[in-house]
């Protein structure tokens, strides 16, 4: 049974993070972890995983609009393998198509004064997690 979940919106410069619960099917943005050419600040990610202690980690898989792999897809898959090995949790990949667009739309809907990349990336992780929870 799933307990708490963490979702990750993988990116080359930033990694958005959200947490959620299957019982309530809700997701909450946690924030972002800086990445350097796709390599995350593992110390910061370690702290988040330790604090939230998720049973499963959901990682957005960047595919194009026709569901074909892109240049960043392989990097995201490699990242997912590293996450699974590092944290010994079940890792699930889900198509993250339009998650950033949805995050921007949500921020505009609530009239967020500053649509920052940090907010967008963390909210995109929420969209990824909500999508995964609705399908599982």
From Swiss-Prot:
Lineage, top ranks: Bacteria, Pseudomonadati, Pseudomonadota, Gammaproteobacteria, Thiotrichales
Keywords for the protein's UniProt record, in alphabetical order: Cytoplasm, Hydrolase, Nuclease, Ribosome biogenesis
Organism from which the protein derives: Francisella tularensis subsp. novicida (strain U112)
NCBIfam families from the UniProt entry: RNAse_H_YqgF (TIGR00250)
Matching SUPFAM superfamilies: Ribonuclease H-like (SSF53098)
One example of a Gene Ontology biological process annotation: rRNA 5'-end processing
Subcellular location: Cytoplasm
Coiled-coil features, chain-numbered ranges: none
Name listed for the protein in its UniProt record: Putative pre-16S rRNA nuclease
